[in-house]
Amino acid sequence: MKITRLLQSLLLAAWSLAASAAAPPMQVPDTIAQRAAACIACHGREGASTDGGYFPRLSGKPEGYLFNQLRSFRDGRRFNADMTHMVQHLSDAYLRELAAYFAGLDLPYPPTPANTDATPEMLARGQALTFQGDAARGIPACAQCHGQALTGVQPGIPGLLGLPRLYLSSQLGAWLTNDRHALAPDCMAKVGKKLTTADINAVTSWLALQPVPADSHPVAALPGPLPIRCSAMNR
């Protein structure tokens, strides 16, 4: 009886091995969309941002801008522990593939917030800085670099609309305090250091209230030269 059971077990094991050998190897899906899924916990579905109040939108941003920011997190020019952990071992080629994926997405923007604690005077100051700048202090208008529609410029200047006020103010604050950097020439570092906290509160309050235009895509080029040299436009 024991011998019969042993033979049955051996035959069953042999059959299982034969079946495993005959079956094709399981293919594990590995697409850039699946790899980018790690980003959605913070940045929202397909990088379309969340209502969490801080994390920026990724989808539809200029590819060059996204690539530069990923490199900056990897190489220590921008500082965020989670982002650094995510990208610190990734190659330029991998980062460029991620940037191209998110840049190619064309998703609707969420509704623009309707409420603000900013005063009318603050909002007027923010609008003036956005479209006129402050020539006496050497501050160019935001629109001179980010486009008149504020939707960004290819290949490397981001749009300023559809972003949380907290995110905008934290980034301008980081330039003001020398905690954020870019490759030279670092145009935003030069501009950011000239801003006051009142300027930052005003311009970010105004920007956060502006609706995103129907055509939210970055423009191909500015109508004139940049007011300040900027590595963002180095192809």
Show where each model-derived region lies.
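Bacterial N-terminal signal peptides
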Residues: 8-18
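Flexible coil segments in periplasmic/lumen-exposed cytochrome c-class electron-transfer proteins
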Residues: 23-36, 45-48, 81-88, 92-151, ...
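Tandem-repeat/low-complexity and Cys-motif detector
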Residues: 56-59, 88, 159-160, 194
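Extracellular/lumenal glycan-associated surfaces
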Residues: 60-63, 69, 158, 162-164, ...
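Fold-core signature of tandem repeat domains
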Residues: 70-73, 90, 102, 172
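The feature marks the first
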Residues: 26-76, 80
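Positively charged n-region of N-terminal signal peptides that target proteins for export
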Residues: 1-5
